[in-house]
Amino acid sequence: MMSRETASSEITPELLLRAYACGIFPMAESVDDPTLFWVEPKLRGVIPLESFRISSRLARTVRSDSFAVTVDTAFNAVIDGCAAPQPGRDNTWINRRIRELYIALHELGHCHSVEVWQGDELVGGLYGVRLGRAFFGESMFHIARDASKVALVHLVARLIAGGFVLLDTQFVTDHLRGFGAIEIPRRRYRALLDAALEGRADFAALPLDQPVPGTDALKIIADRA
């Protein structure tokens, strides 16, 4: 279901959080389109945390710590990276108003980024919204091979450690299917969302101010209950 919102300036961060709690989220047609529309997919993409999959090759990359991974240190740069054209994706739905809204959510503590670095260069990352025990993945990007995948592995380890129960990917791509992403009907999604909104999770269960070794992230995922 999609509903056109022509007065996107009227969407506030607080309204945005209420929308997520109802299972809907905003998008734009393109980076140049100033309007937003609400989306509630009939089939919702989720990655069940209990069945998150990592390939052997990616596990070796994570274990090697060849990338430095940080959290919430370069949120604006991550959303800009997600908005930039990439191979196979010439356009983006992240317009100026989307950028403003999610930066505001970040400043309120409800939106987080995972950054992946090679030296001083940001080469990948992701960002998403936290609400209750749910995390809503918004977008990811990479300019170095596996950088966004490494960000996702570290995110999942943090969610498991913090007691999250729902990782919402909104839609499912072939890329996400490799990690175990599935599509579920709207009614089932809403039941999972309602359960996730009850209780609290701790995004800071793993340190926010220092890197988490890749071996630790992999162990958390391997040892999940």
Swiss-Prot record:
One of its GO terms (cellular component) is cytoplasm. The gene is aat. This is Leucyl/phenylalanyl-tRNA--protein transferase. Transmembrane segments: none annotated. One of its GO terms (molecular function) is leucyl-tRNA--protein transferase activity. GO terms for biological process: protein catabolic process. Its EC number is 2.3.2.6. Belongs to the L/F-transferase family. Its main location: cytoplasm. Gene3D superfamilies: Leucyl/phenylalanyl-tRNA-protein transferase, C-terminal domain (3.40.630.70), Leucyl/phenylalanyl-tRNA-protein transferase, N-terminal domain (3.30.70.3550). It catalyses: N-terminal L-lysyl-[protein] + L-leucyl-tRNA(Leu) = N-terminal L-leucyl-L-lysyl-[protein] + tRNA(Leu) + H(+); N-terminal L-arginyl-[protein] + L-leucyl-tRNA(Leu) = N-terminal L-leucyl-L-arginyl-[protein] + tRNA(Leu) + H(+); L-phenylalanyl-tRNA(Phe) + an N-terminal L-alpha-aminoacyl-[protein] = an N-terminal L-phenylalanyl-L-alpha-aminoacyl-[protein] + tRNA(Phe). It comes from the Bacteria. It comes from Nitrobacter hamburgensis (strain DSM 10229 / NCIMB 13809 / X14). The keyword Lipid metabolism does not apply. InterPro entries: Acyl_CoA_acyltransferase (IPR016181), Leu/Phe-tRNA_Trfase (IPR004616), Leu/Phe-tRNA_Trfase_C (IPR042203), Leu/Phe-tRNA_Trfase_N (IPR042221). It is found in: Cytoplasm. Functions in the N-end rule pathway of protein degradation where it conjugates Leu, Phe and, less efficiently, Met from aminoacyl-tRNAs to the N-termini of proteins containing an N-terminal arginine or lysine. Keywords: Acyltransferase, Cytoplasm, Transferase.
